[in-house]
């Protein structure tokens, strides 16, 4: 079937369970925002600066089961969002960064917002993708989501050229979204060693990362037993 890239992208985000996106509409992502506006599941949250959007997306990932998602314009939108994307990268917080791109069907240089943004954003993300066809859109977004949540989490960047968003092209059925396996239990020897170190410490303390967000009761029990102060990365 033939669908616009914007339609395909939003259907993929719905399949991933995304409920909110953050960003600013512009020349290179208006079609995405038109589709988001018609979604019965996703609410696009508009901001006055992409930096704020990135920190909002970071906060969503930290405090809920949702994946914080940006929808931004290329070049200036990417550089403005970089501080929040970098924060998520350093703290191991999953994030989807969906960026419009210049037209890939024109043999023209110096288009509006033309920038080698992959060279710019690659050091701040786990991976960066440039979509080259309509059929790639949903699988690429699913792959980005999977990478964002696998291993040490972090942001992943996906650029969708505006011509793919605007014009219809051949796409298959939206595939089933990926499922991330829960982390395996740490080896018993490592747990025993950590407990021995805590017992041996004269002034034990707990520095809790985002990965312990589902272990609140256990963390409190350990802290109370050790009478240890607790600090978090949140």
Predicted feature residues:
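N-terminal alpha/beta PP-like core and its mobile active-site loop of ThDP/TPP-dependent enzymes
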Residues: 1-234
């Amino acid at each position: 079937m033939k669908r616009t890239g914007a339609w395909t992208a939003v259907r993929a985000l719905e399949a991933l369970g995304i409920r909110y996106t953050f960003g600013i509409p512009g020349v290179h992502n208006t079609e995405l925002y038109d589709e988001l506006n018609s979604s019965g599941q996703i609410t696009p949250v508009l901001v006055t600066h992409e930096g704020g959007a990135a920190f909002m997306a970071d906060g969503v990932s930290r405090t809920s089961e949702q994946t914080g998602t940006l929808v931004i314009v290329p070049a200036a939108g990417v550089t403005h969002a970089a501080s929040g994307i970098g924060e998520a990268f350093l703290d191991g917080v999953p994030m989807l960064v969906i960026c419009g791109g210049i037209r890939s069907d024109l043999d023209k240089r110096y288009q509006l917002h033309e920038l080698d943004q992959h060279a710019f954003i690659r050091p701040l993300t786990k991976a960066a993708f440039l979509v080259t066809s309509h059929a790639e859109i949903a699988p690429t977004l699913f792959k980005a989501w999977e990478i964002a949540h696998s291993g040490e989490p972090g942001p992943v960047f996906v650029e969708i050229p505006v011509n793919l968003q605007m014009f219809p092209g051949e796409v298959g059925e939206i595939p089933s979204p990926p499922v991330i396996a829960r982390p395996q239990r740490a080896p018993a020897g490592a747990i025993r060693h950590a407990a021995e170190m805590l017992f041996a410490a004269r002034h034990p303390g707990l520095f809790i990362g985002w990965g312990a967000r589902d272990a609140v009761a256990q963390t409190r029990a350990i802290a109370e037993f050790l009478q240890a102060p607790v600090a978090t990365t949140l």
